Amino acid sequence: MTVEWLAEQLKEHNIQLTETQKQQFQTYYRLLVEWNEKMNLTSITDEHDVYLKHFYDSIAPSFYFDFNQPISICDVGAGAGFPSIPLKIMFPQLKVTIVDSLNKRIQFLNHLASELQLQDVSFIHDRAETFGKGVYRESYDVVTARAVARLSVLSELCLPLVKKGGQFVALKSSKGEEELEEAKFAISVLGGNVTETHTFELPEDAGERQMFIIDKKRQTPKKYPRKPGTPNKTPLLEK
């Protein structure tokens, strides 16, 4: 009864899973495994591991950041929808946009959202570098990303999308602190300021996680993000 395990874990953080939410997570797992057979969405397919390392891991940021408010979230490179779809299931009032460079993942997300009957979600097939130059630049309350690149690179992809006064919530595994040191220059150049750092353990010794909350204090200079591929090849680092 893996969804019951998730419910028990969340109860320890004063979060109650409704019957509807339980059904949504069960459907999410079923579709993830079905679609994963025809496209590579995740290397984690064991049911308990998905609930622990994808679902619980995606919801854990809400222990430290208030997602229970009507805010717009952009999730950069969410793959199979992590963390934003589990957060949307838990906090239905969120307005969620996912940007991903692989169209097959967007097809999965569209089908998933339809099956889960999610409202106020949109999935955009684009590179984050291009998306951050367009009409959505500096338009989101919160931008999130879960370990898709080093923090110096992620900051250039994500901070341009955050509105002034909003937050970039970066989710990393255990090496986050050294990445944060390296990324401080880029964060400052891009208009951000690190305001909170949280370190926590997943249940069952499944690993350490770090979460950085970066406030958007100033507008990002127009030249950022640079053209696709450049942030990854030559990250913004202090010379």
Swiss-Prot record:
Q: Does the keyword S-adenosyl-L-methionine apply?
A: yes
Specify which residues bind S-adenosyl-L-methionine according to the UniProt entry for this protein. Answer: 77, 82, 128-129, 146
Q: What is its EC number?
A: 2.1.1.-
Cellular component GO terms held in the UniProt record: cytosol
Task: State the UniProt keywords alphabetically.
Answer: Cytoplasm, Methyltransferase, rRNA processing, S-adenosyl-L-methionine, Transferase
**Keyword Cell inner membrane in annotation:** no
Q: Which Gene3D superfamilies match?
A: Vaccinia Virus protein VP39
Q: What does this protein do?
A: Specifically methylates the N7 position of guanine in position 535 of 16S rRNA.
User: What is the name listed in the Swiss-Prot or TrEMBL entry for this protein?
Assistant: Ribosomal RNA small subunit methyltransferase G
